[in-house]
Amino acid sequence: MKYCRIFSIALLSLVTSSTLLHGINKVEWDFFTYIQADNNLAPFGVINVKDMQKVGSTSDVNILVQWDKPSDNMTYRYKILQNNMVINSSIKQEMGFFPEKELADSMTWVKNFFPAKRYALILWDHGNGVLDRSKKQPTNSWLSLPGISKKYLRDRGILYDFTQNTFLDNVGLSSACAKIKTTIGQNIDFLGTDACLMAMIEIAYQVKSSVNYLVASQQTEPGLGWPYADVLSSLVGIPTMSTADFSTATVQAYSNFYETGDNADSSYTLSAIDVSKIQAATTTFNAVLKAIAQSQLVDKTTTNAGVKIARANTLAFFINDYIDLIDLYDNLTITFNKISGSRNAKKKGSLRDRMAVAAVAIVTAVAAAKIAAQETIVSSMAGTDYSGKAHGLSIYYPANCLVDASYKKTAFSKQTNWVKVLNSLR
């Protein structure tokens, strides 16, 4: 979900050469961008691939693309070279019929033709976070366009194909990543989403068994998306850098690109998430939910009011149901510290006293959960609109506590008591 900017498009130079397709030995990295551009983002795909050509593949890094373009009924696979690109193969069917299978199959091509020690997979397209699209809504209108009606805020998912009217849902994303892990014989080292609103604890949890690092945005992305030349320059410059360092370098390149100059954007966000630590963040989050549930048994009215105040004061993004998790923890701490301070020592066992004790338990649980959430964030940067408030990891929390049906299908929902607590807050 990228919002469109004024742009100019340069023609791509194109060569075909079987001698440049692949080598025998494993390179350090495959940087593979899966471009689903059969939609209104198509011009930006051209710009981004042109940007990749400024760097080009090296003896240590393969820069690869699978590209679905509008209106030609084909899918193209390229190896990107400096100032040109090589057609590896063309599939006589465009992408979008079976998004999960097509994504998994694309990595079979990468593995067979371009074996590498580490793999970076970038999903390029519209993205709308953890909720899946409601099929009841129109599919030819997008949140990314300025002035779009709020009635279209039901489109969710990632990898939208306008021609086939399909998308990859979150269950499909998890399944595709699991299949890719089997294909390459290891976790995906680096999963990037050049798409909007994907830096969520729920997304990281969906892929926790098959991905090492997730690089994504909490907020909408500018139409130009990632600055690929800058990102790739860091990788080809030091191809042996750790995946954590490459994730950090990607966030820094993105920040540099949108911080100043012609591309300046005060609302940008990008973060790198250590997916191996997402289970601890989820477990401690669930402990917070348990403390809230226990507090509700003491005084549901006061507890619910406190949680709702904290939520109201927390940073929300373009989709108002998506809020910053660490900012939520900070606001829960502030709110329930005030409640705990109302304890009446002279009336031990009174409702106020018991509620104060329950509030202390919430604050204690939140402190541990905040640490765990912070430890998932390798790097996070944001423009001035969100600086100091956007910490790098979002969570789904609808203000009205009405839970979207698609959310209940997510692994995070099934492994925590979040939906139950949300229902209890209504």
Each language-model region and where it sits:
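Bacterial Sec-dependent signal peptides at the C-terminal "C-region" and cleavage site
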Residues: T16-K26
